[in-house]
């Protein structure tokens, strides 16, 4: 045994000796039955077979251990203890002094006994007992002399019995089985859901692919249809150029101007008019000659001696021939019929001329549209914002173009208004324009009313252009309709005004209220293109928000004086003073009165044939203290009274939008009752007058 100890590495031997010497000396030589548990604890040595100090003889030690502070206590004689002394235990004479455990020995037995016959406390699961068993097992696996090794056990009392432990184990196992079953179910459900997700994902990808194909095909068909419509419009325009006329470039000095030349349809009408005028002149000349040949009446019968002279005058010439009374009346009746026929023909020519003028206006408008479309950078059907496919140009303004487009996402037609800034503008001016457009967008975006055009979207194209997407209406605006038809019936005009007032009422009921300020026929869209359908209000570029910060009792300040359309603005907008004028929703009331007047009479009540500059210079609106009504066409007194209430000069005396909405003329049942009351009162008055006259008789 000592030979085996001698074969240890010197460094390991020294460490072992220092370890055991320190433990043993601390307790003295009498307590050297220290346990091996510190030596055989888990992880303290390598996996090689343990070499005990007994395997090495004492005389083979060639170097001394380092001094230890406990050596003075451990030296009882002339030499130190052997390593084998630390593996010997005094049978029951003392207590164990293992520094690693610090547990007093309770029972001593051989390793075979401790492993094969564990105490009851160990079987019941005592933690200290299990620790002792593990320690003993570790020691027996590393020691070659099991007879010299003793294991210590400590018995502890536990409340668990084998039945309870078995019950706990069975409950735990059942719970574990349930959990495992639940886990299996959840895993199956998870797998099913994942499979469904994969299927739905594949279906979604398939649907997206189909949708992209449908959108692509829709774009292709829409572009093809738009191209065909463009070709048809240009062909029709070329045909109408010969029939209705065209623009020609004429040179005046160093400049060139465009001059309109009428087509053959107008030339034919002019020739017909000239022919009718010539025939009328000839008939008038013959009527004058007929008057000279008029025979004398019966009271002026010529004497008999004048009969030969009469025959003589007949022989001199037919122009001096005297007609009988019957011949004279017959010839006069023929001339009257011819004049009546020429008058009827002239009226037909005038009607045809007016019709051709309306068609010519459409033709001129189409020529300008085609010219602007050909010069536009968006003529080749681009898709803006990956959503809006431009089809054809609807119109062009000062800084904007309006295109009919198709919304590929919502699958609907829309009107795309492209705002293009002048590249030569200063950055400050561009910023102000963009700020103004953003303000219009914010105002218009929140509005939701059937009589107001909806604003769908707003986006930028580049630094100098941006777009607004509006609701598309098929028809034209009221201004174009009035240019075509001059005027309309009172019922049609009243229907339009009712819808406009309904929209204004909505604008003044929301918070904060809004003044449109630019209400005119050009901003009233006819949905069906006729005066007997629905209308929608658009263009909120000059609108005013009546918030609490800007609006007071007497109105809000007009910061944009000079803007707007002067024919439809009230006098307070033209007042010039130290402070800007105050306005309210009564501005829109004045505009309603002007529009209603124009619809009924075919002209504006103030400044009809004047330009905006002339109106401003001559103070036309400031002088419009009273409205005058022409005798024709005939208009009801209620309509005239309604117009007078709208066109009151002083804004303090003018009704507001809420009073306008409740006006009797715009409420059918009230208007009928008022009319019936008026008729009954007139009937009563006439009855009383007749009774009074009969009584006086």
Curated annotation (Swiss-Prot):
A GO molecular function held by the record: protein serine/threonine kinase activity
Organism, scientific name: Danio rerio (Zebrafish)
Role noted for this protein: Serine/threonine-protein kinase involved in the process of chromatin assembly and probably also DNA replication, transcription, repair, and chromosome segregation. Negative regulator of amino acid starvation-induced autophagy.
Residue stretches of biased makeup (Polar residues): 31-44, 109-145
UniProt name for this protein: Serine/threonine-protein kinase tousled-like 2
Keyword flag Acetylation: no
Transmembrane regions listed in the UniProt entry: none
Gene Ontology CC annotation, any one: nucleoplasm
